[in-house]
Curated annotation (Swiss-Prot):
It is found in: Cytoplasm. Belongs to the imidazoleglycerol-phosphate dehydratase family. It comes from Verminephrobacter eiseniae (strain EF01-2). Pfam families: IGPD (PF00475). One of its GO terms (molecular function) is imidazoleglycerol-phosphate dehydratase activity. This is Imidazoleglycerol-phosphate dehydratase. The gene is hisB. The lineage of its organism: Bacteria, Pseudomonadati, Pseudomonadota, Betaproteobacteria, Burkholderiales. InterPro entries: IGPD_sf (IPR038494), ImidazoleglycerolP_deHydtase (IPR000807), ImidazoleglycerP_deHydtase_CS (IPR020565), Ribosomal_Su5_D2-typ_SF (IPR020568).
Length: 210
């Protein structure tokens, strides 16, 4: 197990849903900044080109401003980099959401990319859960090991406190499969994070907390 140091900013419950988190271990040094009410701008430096491309899809289609800087042990492989970015992004998202008052909480999205079709269902529940099925047609996409898709989302949900159901329903090209998943994730997350004006700032749970 590695140790980590969190350096957050932003106030829970504030109107600005912005947060910055740093995570430093013997394997990676990661900093993530998110603005949940952004315009989809992204600055991404993970050292893995295809992974940067997927994070860019998340920002663009989620309308989240996202700044990710990671220096990882890529001389070994991409596992620690991808997993730790997922962890740190989850921590930043959790902090930026604050008390979660007024958010829609639940959402889903279907996104096609040519022959590929993916569905993602989100519950911002406070309970981490990942249920993922992507029958990738190839083990690698450029310099990206497709198994790391699971590691990214597992790290993310564990620290964001989100339940995700991710299914690639159709697909032949592995690039298309993965990209349709990330686009659907972005669209569903964007909808779940939207503030519902009819909720009058209430928590979307009969428990009174998420």
């Amino acid at each position: 197990m590695t140790s980590s140091a969190l350096v957050p900013s932003g106030l829970p419950g504030s109107l600005d849903r912005i947060a910055e988190v740093s995570r430093n271990t013997a394997e990676t040094r990661v900093s993530v900044r998110v603005n949940l009410d952004g315009t989809g701008q992204a600055k991404l430096r993970t050292g893995i080109g295809f992974f940067d491309h997927m994070l860019d899809q998340t920002a663009r289609h989620g309308l989240i401003d996202l700044d990710v800087d990671c220096a990882g042990d890529l001389h070994i492989d991409g596992h620690h980099t991808v997993e730790d970015v997922g962890i740190t992004l989850g921590q930043a998202l959790a902090r930026a959401m604050g008390d979660k008052k007024g958010i829609c909480r639940y959402a889903h999205a279907y996104v096609p990319l040519d022959e590929a079709l993916s569905r993602v269902v989100v519950d911002i529940s406070g309970r981490p859960g990942l249920h993922l099925h992507i029958p990738f047609s190839a083990g690698r996409i450029g310099d990206f090991d497709t198994q790391l898709t699971h590691e990214f989302f597992q790290g993310f949900v564990n620290h964001a406190g989100i339940t995700l159901h991710i299914d690639n329903l159709k697909g032949v090209n592995a690039h298309h499969q993965c990209e349709s998943v990330f686009k659907a994730f972005a669209r569903a997350l964007r909808a779940a994070l939207e503030r519902d004006p009819r909720s009058a700032g209430r928590i979307a749970s009969t428990k009174g907390s998420l």
